[in-house]
Amino acid sequence: MLFGMARIAIIGGGSIGEALLSGLLRAGRQVKDLVVAERMPDRANYLAQTYSVLVTSAADAVENATFVVVAVKPADVEPVIADLANATAAAENDSAEQVFVTVVAGITIAYFESKLPAGTPVVRAMPNAAALVGAGVTALAKGRFVTPQQLEEVSALFDAVGGVLTVPESQLDAVTAVSGSGPAYFFLLVEALVDAGVGVGLSRQVATDLAAQTMAGSAAMLLERMEQDQGGANGELMGLRVDLTASRLRAAVTSPGGTTAAALRELERGGFRMAVDAAVQAAKSRSEQLRITPE
């Protein structure tokens, strides 16, 4: 079935489920092709009233759905996946045609494949918090029964909330450490920059405005330069590494002997790179500890 004609069931109406719902609607999806399963009455009412979407049980939502996005908390996965498996079997859906997409942190593809009907295509997706404003990045890892077309269709689904890339499942713990936890690193840096700005005489409001806009503008510069480099603009090599692009931009805004050079010297002296590396390593290790695989 073509993605444009597909029915999408979102199981779990929390922040990520709502982000995907709102993103799909912004991208032009028809509300009649979307259904949400949410157990909390207040939350269910909110979603129904805000988006005019059908909110029902998981068992009803999965019936006739081409894509089933599981967006519940890890602690709720076992009973939810049991309900979905039973509903799928009862509805006699073709397991090879119904794609399950999990955004549940730490739950492996093998776990879902072991609980769902044999041959069910499973894609594991790792979006980050920026999906809430349509500017996230999602890493996808495909299970063994997923066809190239199905993976392309799932990628199109997550295009609605930001950028999408595909990685082996073995890299998802690293993805979690970089992009999943990444917004928190960013917010901590902004917090520190604002505090430092107040320390040199700025009001907190002015320091916050300056820091936030500087971060947004710097990210825009990096993304634009990456796009130029990867497209071979100005005769440059295709596929230039992002770290080299960032390094070039940093050099371009750092005058020898100037204020930025003095500031960067202090960051290096304070172990900035080592702290970032240690943080990412710790997040990756914790993600590995939280992983749930088939028994």
Curated annotation (Swiss-Prot):
Reactions catalysed: L-proline + NADP(+) = (S)-1-pyrroline-5-carboxylate + NADPH + 2 H(+); L-proline + NAD(+) = (S)-1-pyrroline-5-carboxylate + NADH + 2 H(+)
Q: Where in the cell is it found?
A: Cytoplasm
Name-wise, this protein is Pyrroline-5-carboxylate reductase
Q: Name one GO cellular component term.
A: cytoplasm
A Pfam family found in this protein is P5CR_dimer
Q: Which domain of life is it from?
A: Bacteria
EC number(s)? 1.5.1.2
UniProt main location, coarse: cytoplasm
Looking up SUPFAM superfamilies in the UniProt record yields: 6-phosphogluconate dehydrogenase C-terminal domain-like, NAD(P)-binding Rossmann-fold domains
Which top class of enzyme applies to this chain? Answer: oxidoreductase
- Whether Cytoplasm counts among this entry's keywords is yes
UniProt keyword terms in alphabetical order: Amino-acid biosynthesis, Cytoplasm, NADP, Oxidoreductase, Proline biosynthesis
> What are the recorded Gene Ontology BP terms?
L-proline biosynthetic process; proline biosynthetic process
Q: Which organism is it from?
A: Mycobacterium tuberculosis (strain ATCC 25618 / H37Rv)
Q: Which HAMAP family does UniProt cross-reference here? A: P5C_reductase
Similarity section: Belongs to the pyrroline-5-carboxylate reductase family.
Q: Which GO terms describe its molecular function?
A: magnesium ion binding; manganese ion binding; pyrroline-5-carboxylate reductase activity
Protein's job: Catalyzes the reduction of 1-pyrroline-5-carboxylate (PCA) to L-proline.
InterPro entries, per database record: 6-PGluconate_DH-like_C_sf, NAD(P)-bd_dom_sf, P5C_Rdtase_cat_N, P5CR-like_CS, P5CR_dimer, Pyrroline-COOH_reductase
Q: Which gene encodes it?
A: proC
**NCBIfam families per the UniProt record, alphabetical:** proC
Recorded metabolic or biological pathway in which this protein acts = Amino-acid biosynthesis; L-proline biosynthesis; L-proline from L-glutamate 5-semialdehyde: step 1/1
